[in-house]
């Protein structure tokens, strides 16, 4: 059972001017009486226009940043691809140079070996060789045909070398490629001028198209130039391969000729040995010896021509290798210069295009389109409708606030009454508790006294009974006993009536069995 007082209501009592809504107390309602509806509409319109302008500016900035990022990523990817392509080409060119250098070294070694063999063959004695005239003439014809072939091949190689030198000296291909690039640059500049003179909304589209056209044309010009140079390099490589094949053929023919000469020398040595064994000599033999001497001199002359042809072939090979190296160096230099020029021009044009795009975006952000105006008008209408609905809500809220203020005034009066009733109730409750305690004490005293009285009565009865048994008659004793029994019953009824407590409400007079239920009833009845 809780006996706490209701003074908490007095302690937590609020003033009628404090917060009456559900929101936090520090957020006070705006005093809308100071603003007119026209001013509110103007403020709402200004806020809406500023919000829309900020959103458009953010969108334009995001789009511009995305476009720049995409362009930069594409440009970096293109640069990476070009670098990889040039690295692959340089590696292939280096591999080709290494292979050609190995082939040249092998050819030089073979030529040196052939020179040594030819010198050894020229040092061998051929004066004592005696061969028949028919075989000598056949060998002579074969050697002459080989010399003619070698001279023709030499002339072809010299023509190839002269053509290569002319190609190296002439810069037609590079000039053509530069002309193509300059044409593309002129077209790009014209497109940029058109973009600058074009109206505002069409500038972004024209700039993107012009940039794409210029990039495609510059890429096509660079590709055409590279394809042209690759064709020239492939033609030179084919010429080199043909020259190498011709050199191999000449080497094979020289080997065959040397083998035949060695066979003839062996035959001549064998016959000379046979003729020394036999004695006698005739005029025919003298003529044959003279013919053999002439054949030997012709063979020596042919050997000298072959060696000179070998030297000329070596010189032609060296010139070809030098020409190829010069051409490759010039090609690499031209590629590097062209790439540097195109890269620098593309960077300049990219920066100029970015500047123009920034200017266009600024101008477009300053301008407002018709669609934007329509959207703003629609939003203004919606805002006016929302303001009207909010104004109605505000009026309703004001009415409810006035009602709540009136209710608060009545609540203060009711609270004061409640405090009075509570104080009275607490005082009555304390008094009743004291009375109840006194009643309980008196009941205890009564019980003790009744017990003592019962004990005295029992003692008196016993003494009376003893006295009657001693002195009185039975009749008088029976009457006295009936009187005493009746008196004892009355005393018991009076005791029971005194022991039952009475719990009744002071306001309505309702009788209750317990003090707790009486307190609850009193609270409900009074409040």
Curated annotation (Swiss-Prot):
Region annotated Disordered, chain positions: 1-32, 101-143, 186-214, 262-292
Coiled coil: 38-170, 239-458
InterPro entries cross-referenced by the UniProt entry: CC2-LZ_dom (IPR032419), NEMO_N (IPR021063), NEMO_ZF (IPR034735), Optineurin/NFkB_EssMod (IPR051301)
Annotated region described as Interaction with Rab8, given as residue ranges: 58-209
CDD domains: UBAN
Domain remark text: Ubiquitin-binding motif (UBAN) is essential for its inhibitory function, subcellular localization and interaction with TBK1.
Protein's name according to its UniProt entry: Optineurin
UniProt source species: Pongo abelii
């Amino acid at each position: 059972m809780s006996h706490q007082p209701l003074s908490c209501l007095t302690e937590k009592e609020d003033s009628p001017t404090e917060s009456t809504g559900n929101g936090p107390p520090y957020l006070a309602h705006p005093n809308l009486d100071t603003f007119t509806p026209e001013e509110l509409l103007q403020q709402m319109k200004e806020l809406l226009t500023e919000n829309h302008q900020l959103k458009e500016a953010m969108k334009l900035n995001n789009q511009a940043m995305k476009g720049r990022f995409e362009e930069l990523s594409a440009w970096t990817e293109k640069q990476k691809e070009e670098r990889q392509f040039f690295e692959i080409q340089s590696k292939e060119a280096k591999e080709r140079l290494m292979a050609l250098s190995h082939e040249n070294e092998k050819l030089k070694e073979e030529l040196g070996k052939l020179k040594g063999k030819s010198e050894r063959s020229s040092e061998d004695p051929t004066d004592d060789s005696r061969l028949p005239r028919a075989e000598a003439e056949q060998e002579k014809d074969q050697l002459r045909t080989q010399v003619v072939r070698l001279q023709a091949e030499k002339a072809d190689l010299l023509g190839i070398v002269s053509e290569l030198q002319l190609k190296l000296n002439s810069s037609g291909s590079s000039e053509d490629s530069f002309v193509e690039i300059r044409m593309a640059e002129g077209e790009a500049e014209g497109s940029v001028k058109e973009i600058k003179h074009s109206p505002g909304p069409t500038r972004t589209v024209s700039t993107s198209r012009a940039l794409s056209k210029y990039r495609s044309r510059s890429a096509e010009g660079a590709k055409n130039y590279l394809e042209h140079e690759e064709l020239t390099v492939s033609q030179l490589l084919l010429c080199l391969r043909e020259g190498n094949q011709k050199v191999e053929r000449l080497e094979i023919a020289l080997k065959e000729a040397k083998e035949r000469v060695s066979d003839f020398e062996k035959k001549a040595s064998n016959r000379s040995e046979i003729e020394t064994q036999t004695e006698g000599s005739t005029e025919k033999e003298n003529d044959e010896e003279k013919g053999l001497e002439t054949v030997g001199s012709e063979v020596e002359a042919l050997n000298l021509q072959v060696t000179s042809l070998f030297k000329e072939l070596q010189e032609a090979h060296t010139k070809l290798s030098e020409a190829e190296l010069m051409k490759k160096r010039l090609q690499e230099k031209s590629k590097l210069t062209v790439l540097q020029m195109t890269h620098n021009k593309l960077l300049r044009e990219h920066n100029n295009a970015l500047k123009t795009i920034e200017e266009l975006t600024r101008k477009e952000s300053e301008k407002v389109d018709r669609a934007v105006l329509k959207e703003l008008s629609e939003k203004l209408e919606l805002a006016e409708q929302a303001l009207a609905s909010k104004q109605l809500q505000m009026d309703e809220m004001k009415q409810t606030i006035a009602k709540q203020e009136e209710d608060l005034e009545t609540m203060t009066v009711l609270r004061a009454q409640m405090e009075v009733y509570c104080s009275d109730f607490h005082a009555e409750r304390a008094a009743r508790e004291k009375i109840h305690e006194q009643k309980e004490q008196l009941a205890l005293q009564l019980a003790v006294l009744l017990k003592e009285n019962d004990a005295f009565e029992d003692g008196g009865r016993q003494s009376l009974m003893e006295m009657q048994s001693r002195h009185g008659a039975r009749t008088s004793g029976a009457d006295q006993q009936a009187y005493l029994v009746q008196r004892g019953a009355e005393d018991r009824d009076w005791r029971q009536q005194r022991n039952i407590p009475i719990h009744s409400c002071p306001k309505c007079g309702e009788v209750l069995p317990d003090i707790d239920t009486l307190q609850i009833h009193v609270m409900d009845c009074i409040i």
